[in-house]
């Protein structure tokens, strides 16, 4: 229950914004969101001393759909910040995109502090991989870096291939700038793009980290940043970092869930982000390289730690795993679904050959092979972790070999990370779910451009149970928000995907839009007779209709959204000549350049037409005359073309369900709402949405999809 102190603090600081910002208008929807968040967080269950952790069923969790214009970030920062301070928690704000993270840290939080008078401290959290490791950097850039503790040339271990002069020069430049404190060690702060292969050599990773024993601990960018996170009220992160922390048990990178209130913005991205986090994959080639090189490392570790027996066990496990992987070569070579096309053209036409294990079941006759591979990987991981612990102990005890042990620990970290990845894959591949449980998706792909390499993959088909048990049931409180969370007028899809459907006390709230859609916009569905199921005829129809809908001389912006890159390109090529100079096609220019040219054309009194795909249907902000018309070529149905979706669809069908109705249509509803949402961005905007897909009229689900769109005036 909210205390009077909390109520007064929220009211007073919100009123301060109006006093300090001329023209600020309190919005009813924003106030409603503030109240909903504060009330949810006030219901947090606390753990009394000597008692077990409280059983949380969603009483302090709210799912809030806040349309564009509500002012969501101000609402959750104000309510969440105050509630975190009064309840002794930390506020963790997580977003899906870098753009929103930067907006929160650079604009929204400073604005709130300045205008409301609320004293909030905040910091941006990033994963280890965004920071360099000074120890690795200095080792690679010292004059003797071509020789290392293993007695091997650096290219053999520190580099996968001989470093180029420009690569070494770049690392020396980075080292010079870092040591002079002109570069803070954050990859995003380096003025030029650093190639992934180069950054991997100097990045901070948990296995290679020397922690408190590191001679460069005092200048380590990662630890300096983490120290700051321990002192602030608000931590701004992204979904990937949040999920990484949860997968490690929580409280490793970010504050512990039990001590945190979460604001999950752009929450509709969370389920698929979580799936990626809980999945695993490894390359056959990289695994073999790792296992072949490993004995050179274990021998050196044994000599420095007196752990010869443990090193021998690791070598035996590595040999066993290597034998298993070589055995897999025979099985993979005989699998028809992994055969490559007979010509280079065939390879380019098709995706990489994939062997999907139907229903996640291990193929007949391979049960023992899968089990043996998993056992060998698990055993190897156990032994290399033991060797790593021995290295850490030796580093604390031995002074004379300190530098050698440091170098070896850092290099060994790469191998542990890869072995951990291999073991995770085979743990999933060997898992047999209990009868009635969701299957795991399991598949193997073959590189079309490298016929000798295969990728082993495994993934849950849903992240719901992981999120429910690892996050929601542990968190002190959470709010999930986005402009689009409902599908077909219901929160069921997002609740099911996130696992919140299992927490019955979770509250949901759909806020009213501040826009007058019936006067600001129109919805037009022209009589397009060609069905999208006939791609050629439908493309011809779009080419016919666009000149009727878009003037080549009126100085307004038009956004045309396609579901197919091929159709987008075909239409662009077949439009009348006078339209070609007006076109800005996604993929032909960097996004920032494309948008800059679009705004410039409008400012110069010219028409401008953007052709875009699904990614332009979300997050693109084109207010005013920059977007007066949105044309949707086809309903955004996603085809179940990846192994996870195929496995999920089969499981639904086996349970008597219909994946098209249960998944495809609801997800299309969300995408369609997002696409339509590109039109009206402010209370002054106006325009028209046109849908060139006759299925909204001819199919029953079409009316369901239309019913969920803003109440524009219908024409035609």
Tell me the role of every PLM-derived stretch.
Residues 47-78:
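Walker A/P-loop
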Residues 2-18, 25, 49-57, 87-90, ...:
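A substrate-engagement module of RecA-like helicase motors
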Residues 199-235, 243-253, 387-529, 538-539, ...:
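A contiguous, basic/glycine-rich beta-loop/short-helix subdomain that forms a polymer-engagement track
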Residues 526-537, 588-697:
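Conserved RecA-like P-loop NTPase helicase motor core
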Residues 38-42, 73-87, 107-111:
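Walker A/P-loop NTP-binding motif
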Residues 563-587:
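Conserved helicase motor "Helicase C" RecA-like lobe of SF1/SF2 P-loop NTPases
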Residues 469, 526-563:
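Conserved interdomain hinge at the start of the Helicase C-terminal
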Residues 76, 82, 99-102, 107-110, ...:
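Signature of the SF2 helicase/ATPase Hel1-core->accessory helical subdomain module
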